[in-house]
């Protein structure tokens, strides 16, 4: 018989490790296993090895609510974040529950047994593995680890230099003294450009359109002062609350006063780079937070541009040549190395196949329940963080909600929990998975994602304060979550 666990957590990255820590703290008698397809924990922070890899938000909010970030830098480099995750896993004894080289391919739900059968492959020997569980908690991330987005780059096969994608950075790439073109304008490109500019002959960031940027120090003076005066846990709690409040206020201002926010953001860039560069390369056509803002720690990209070691070109590619790229303006960029920072390939939960009682699940046909579960899919939750704040702020909330749910089911003697549309919900209009967020990587996958409705709880909210109250305090018997015991309906 397949091995059984109360909970199977898929993914040992930032979300999965956090989920296991919460489960162990709040549901200590539940058996669980973490299935991880890679050879190590860390997810994004183990996968990405490109120069300068770092967080794009502060670690007092990207860190777990239960584990203080106790370093001088609040904008942290990738290795420091990976070390933090390892510490969290070891301190909470969840590392012993991880099974590496177990790539989950799908899962099948049986209402008769009230169990998921999880289908995985052992990536070392290729052997199929089956496990069963009562609850499936998906924390496998939101993008494909195997296939990044393949942007159309005409004639790239003609290029005789080196082409690198940030998702698969070679350890032995020597770019010292080389001419580098980084294609892209997102967080990855803006991280790589100043990092490579320190050694390369010159780095050009080639973008089709500009992105909003904001510079801030990589050290939080208030946080570091509090750490000198107070215990780490208290100092962290105060700093975290401060930063969450400021993030919420800033996001609210950008949405309610977009023109004013736009002028403030562009004004800050003008002070660093002047009008000509700002107007040509840092003035987006959309409003702030229609797409995610890019963070520049200590204004590192500004410094690289001012020094002449880096530059920005806003144009479209006509074709690659053996020695570079010809643009629509007829300009040509010569390059020894091209970095294609053109984006991630988003996927529905973990690129996996699911079925409920033999019927395949098409997530595009479902409605999202509070942004964490799916209509008519029992005993499953999936983590997707905030697009306007640190990912972990939401993954912590979702993990705590799942623990609440599991304890509620234990207390009521139920073993199945399924979000189902009420009669009054059946004519709801379908709205996109996330409202008002327009980057290409999101738009490319939106048609395959669950829909929002026009009323709670069929929403995917992006506001931490309101969602914290809902997920941690709102009644679970909300008329949507249907709790049953196998072969017997229970009214809760």
Q: What residues fall within each predicted segment?
A:
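Beta1-alpha1 glycine-rich phosphate/pyrophosphate-binding loop at the start
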Residues: 5, 9-10, 14-98, 207-208, ...
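Feature captures the FAD/FMN-dependent oxidoreductase FAD-binding
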Residues: 72-144, 272, 319
């Amino acid at each position: 018989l397949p091995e059984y666990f109360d909970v199977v957590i898929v993914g040992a990255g930032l979300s999965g490790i956090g989920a296991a820590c919460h489960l162990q703290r709040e549901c200590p008698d539940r058996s669980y296993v973490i299935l991880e397809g890679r050879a190590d924990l860390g997810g994004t922070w183990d996968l990405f090895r490109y120069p300068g890899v770092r967080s794009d938000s502060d670690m007092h909010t990207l860190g777990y609510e239960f584990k203080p970030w106790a370093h001088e830098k609040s904008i942290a480099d990738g290795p420091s974040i990976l070390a933090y995750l390892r510490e969290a896993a070891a301190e909470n004894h969840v590392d012993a529950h991880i099974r590496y080289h177990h790539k989950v391919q799908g899962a099948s739900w049986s209402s008769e047994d009230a169990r998921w059968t999880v289908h995985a492959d052992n990536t070392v020997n290729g052997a199929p593995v089956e496990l069963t569980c009562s609850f499936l908690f998906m924390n496998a991330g939101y993008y494909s680890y195997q296939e990044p987005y393949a942007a159309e780059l005409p004639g790239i096969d003609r290029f005789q230099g080196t082409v690198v994608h940030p998702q698969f950075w070679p350890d032995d790439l020597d770019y010292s003294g080389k001419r580098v073109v980084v294609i892209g304008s997102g967080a990855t490109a803006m991280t790589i450009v100043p990092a490579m500019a320190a050694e390369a002959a010159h780095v050009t960031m080639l973008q089709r359109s500009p992105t909003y940027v904001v510079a801030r120090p990589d050290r939080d003076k208030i946080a570091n002062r509090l750490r000198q005066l107070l215990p780490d846990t208290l100092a962290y709690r105060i700093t975290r609350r401060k930063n969450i409040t400021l993030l919420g206020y800033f996001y609210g201002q950008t949405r309610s006063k977009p023109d004013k926010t736009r002028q403030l953001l562009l004004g800050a860039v003008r002070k660093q780079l002047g009008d000509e560069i700002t107007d040509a390369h840092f003035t987006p056509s959309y409003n702030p937070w229609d797409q995610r803002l890019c963070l520049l720690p200590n204004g590192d990209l500004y410094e690289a541009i001012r020094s002449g070691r880096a530059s920005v070109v806003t144009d479209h590619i006509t074709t690659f040549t053996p020695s570079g790229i010809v643009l629509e303006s007829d300009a040509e960029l010569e390059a020894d190395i091209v970095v294609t920072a053109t984006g991630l390939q988003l996927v529905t939960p973990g690129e996996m196949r699911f079925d409920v009682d033999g019927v395949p699940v098409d997530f595009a046909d479902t409605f999202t329940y509070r942004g964490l579960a799916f209509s008519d899919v029992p005993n499953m939750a999936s983590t997707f963080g905030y697009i306007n704040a640190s990912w972990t702020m939401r993954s912590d909330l979702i993990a705590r909600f799942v623990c609440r749910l599991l304890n509620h089911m234990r207390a009521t003697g139920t073993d199945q929990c399924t979000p189902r549309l009420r009669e009054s919900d059946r004519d709801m209009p379908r709205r996109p998975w996330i409202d008002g967020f327009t980057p290409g990587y999101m738009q490319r996958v939106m048609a395959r994602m669950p829909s929002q409705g026009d009323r709670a709880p069929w929403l995917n909210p992006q506001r931490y304060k309101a969602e914290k109250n809902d997920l941690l305090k709102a009644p679970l018997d909300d008329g949507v979550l249907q709790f049953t015991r196998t072969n017997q309906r229970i009214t809760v």
